[in-house]
Amino acid sequence: DIKKGDKVITYHIEKDEQGRYHESHITSTIECVIRTKCENNKETMVQLGNLLITPYHPIIDMVNYEKEWSFPIKRGTSREHKCNYMYTFVTSNRQSLVIERYIFATFGHGLKENIVSHDYFGTESIINDLKKFPTYEEGYVNLTKNMIHRDENGLVSKIE
């Protein structure tokens, strides 16, 4: 199990003005593990190898040497899977995790590229909301779906 303080491999990619990609893999530290309870112990997910992921959680496919963010739903079929919890992470440097040969966007990532950009998940706003939970400093936050609030467009905008 991944926990606060664990060292993980993170990934960063930037595209310069000439369209060239600059990539780096570095070691980062897990700041917090976010565990969201699946309703009725099931969730709609896409299976990519051994990775089960929600259909719209941005990834980069390292298996096929891709450089652009995409949604898992473009790579596989979404279906209901039995699962008790979904896990998301906050890294100390806010960089993306490497999981099962996929790059996995973390909360507060600050990325502005197409697909991965998000006004809440990609900013410190989500980190600030998570820090309000008394267990954040211990390295974990347990959520239920009713703690996740959406705006008028259906996008997640607050957790409390």
What function would you assign to each model-found segment?
Residues 1-160:
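HINT/intein-family self-processing domains that catalyze protein splicing or autoproteolytic maturation
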